[in-house]
Amino acid sequence: MSKVIGIDLGTTNSCVAVLEGGEPKVIPNPEGARTTPSVVAFKNGERQVGEVAKRQSITNPNTIMSIKRHMGTDYTVEIEGKKYTPQEVSAIILQHLKSYAESYLGETVSKAVITVPAYFNDAERQATKDAGKIAGLEVERIINEPTAAALAYGLDKTEEDQTILVYDLGGGTFDVSILELGDGVFEVRSTAGDNRLGGDDFDQVIIDHLVSEFKKENGIDLSKDKMALQRLKDAAEKAKKDLSGVSSTQISLPFITAGEAGPLHLELTLTRAKFEELSSHLVERTMGPVRQALQDAGLSASEIDKVILVGGSTRIPAVQEAIKKETGKEAHKGVNPDEVVALGAAIQGGVITGDVKDVVLLDVTPLSLGIETMGGVFTKLIERNTTIPTSKSQVFSTAADNQTAVDIHVLQGERPMAADNKTLGRFQLTDIPPAPRGVPQIEVSFDIDKNGIVNVSAKDLGTGKEQNITIKSSSGLSDDEIERMVKEAEENAEADAKKKEEIELRNEADQLVFTTEKTLKDLEGKADEAQVKKANEAKDALKAAIEKNDLDEIKAKKDELQAIVQELSMKLYEEAAKQAQAQQDGGAGAKKADDNVVDAEYEEVNDDKDQK
């Protein structure tokens, strides 16, 4: 079975890993980094992904960042006259990860396990699966990020029973999960979180502080200047990282803007204490889900054996301090918070291929599922934190006499009223025989698969008529749309490969021009003038083709020049070989002429005694 890669598709950074020799390994990207920024840019019709896209985001308005925040919504971003859905943008990132995983493994990769925040709802999970499909990946399993982290942490610790709290503060999402490990079983007891809280928000409080300080000093609002704002974002992210290791950092942004008197510079010292003051409300916000998860699992903080930190933002000292205070436990730091989720996904990939034995993953549904019933009430069929896969049925009836159809309004959430929860979908069961209200028996069944994706059916028990729906969010893509996007993604991959081929051809041509010039210099006075002239002409023709950027001509002229240079080199070697032979023959003749010469006697001196 071909390898199943593990992908942590993050808001800020993404990471890909694979199981090799029973051990999960992170696959470095072409730049040698172990994580890749989740950034996509479009420039002159060319797509850029990762570090290269992030670097030029200041000057390129066609740069998309943190697209994960919009998964499962009907948000679109327009670039160069074309609208892109979050699924398509995520697919471009996944395609990039897939391509360098293939280069590393030396084989085609078509299967993946992709992680999502534990608190992702059905629409967000479905969108992630669609993104994988568009990228040409068969998504074998969608697993929750904290669960993946626990897998990576606990694979070699499954003999002892442990209760683990995973605190996952990513770039744009926050999750807490409580898991029980024992006998190779990873059971999620509870999960809670906030899909609109992450490292980006910590950056934002620094940006707001810089904007307000600069406005106080210079009377100019930098938040209105797009270019300045991007520089502030980069500086804020760097300052946040610096303050994890030092108690104060200098933020210096020369020529940030211009006033009436000329250019203005931003110079400011940010202390860790000030940063903690600015972000204290965010740290406190993360404690709510921690308490919620403990309550749902029916545990007290003292019953937690280990705390694992996931996500780069957990390096913030105030965050670590808050967790320690809440749980009374020092967080375990034996795993890299940026890589642990991808490593866990790779282990789950190994479970699927059968390379990892005796590991069972029991995940849970993060939110309750149910339908709207009379009076706009939300009636739950599956409670949150139910182990998946699972199915549940309940019998309902009609609300009015002679009602021949019922609307099934499927919802996900925790609020008592239907209107306050997230609509997953609607469908209708028709042709119910007319009868007094309360008489027809309509069985509604919910089924959640191992990826957390929901199927709902309604059946009239009297007639046996059934209607079902696989939940697709309002942003859910139809099969035709996915098919079209897959085609586009493949075409783009071909275009990218063609571009790479073109660059390589130009590089080879440049290299050949350089080596030809060097060879001709070495051949001065040693080669036939006509041959040298021919080589020079071919070299100039290739240079002209490079200037014109005509690829077919470059290829033809390159092949021509290569043949001439090879011929010249061969002649040079032949000439050198002839000369060497002539010298050898000359040396042998000299030896014959000297046959009558008598060798001189010699005396060898020895320290002990003279010998003659």
Swiss-Prot record:
Residues 576-612 are annotated as: Disordered. The modification Phosphothreonine is found at T173. The keyword Ribonucleoprotein does not apply. Disulfide bonds: none annotated. The keyword Zinc does not apply. GO terms for molecular function: ATP binding; ATP-dependent protein folding chaperone; unfolded protein binding. Keywords: ATP-binding, Chaperone, Nucleotide-binding, Phosphoprotein, Stress response. Signal peptide: none annotated. It holds the Pfam family HSP70. Acts as a chaperone. Belongs to the heat shock protein 70 family. This is Chaperone protein DnaK.
